[in-house]
Amino acid sequence: MIAPDTSVLVAGFATWHEGHEAAVRALNRGVHLIAHAAVETYSVLTRLPPPHRIAPVAVHAYLADITSSNYLALDACSYRGLTDHLAEHDVTGGATYDALVGFTAKAAGAKLLTRDLRAVETYERLRVEVELVT
C-alpha cells in the first residue's frame, strides 16, 4: 500500500508545478489518502495566490478521483501514541504535522510518497517507510 503526502498531492494537481509529471506517475500507481494530507491539500489548493488558486469544487473532485477508498486515519489511542513519539523523538512545531502524516502511514502499513525533503528527516526519525517522488 502507498500513500502520498501533501507535497505529492499538490504537485499532482498543479500542472505548472515542476514535480507535476512525477507526482502524476506516483498517484497513478494506486494510492490511499491519509485524512490529514487530504484536508491539508484542500486547504493549500484553495488558498494559493491567484492565478493558481483552485475552486473548492475542483479540489474536492480531484481528491475524490484519486481513490474511492476510505481515508487512512489514526484512532484515538494512536493519537495518544503519536504524542508519545513526538516527545521521544524531539519533533516540534510544524514538523508535528509531518509526523502525523507519517505516523498514520506507518500505522496503516503504507509506504509514504513525498516530494518534501524537509519532512523526510521527520519521517525517518519515526521510522516511516518513505519514497521520494522525483
Curated annotation (Swiss-Prot):
Its EC number is 3.1.-.-. Coiled coil: none annotated. SUPFAM superfamilies: PIN domain-like (SSF88723). Its cofactor is Mg(2+). GO terms for molecular function: magnesium ion binding; RNA nuclease activity. InterPro entries: PIN-like_dom_sf, PIN_dom, VapC_family. Mg(2+) binds at D5, D98. Pfam families: PIN. Residues 3-126 form the PINc domain. It comes from the Bacteria. Keywords: Hydrolase, Magnesium, Metal-binding, Nuclease, Toxin-antitoxin system. Toxic component of a type II toxin-antitoxin (TA) system. An RNase. Its cognate antitoxin is VapB40. Physically interacts with non-cognate antitoxin VapB27 and cognate antitoxin VapB40. Belongs to the PINc/VapC protein family. This is Ribonuclease VapC40.
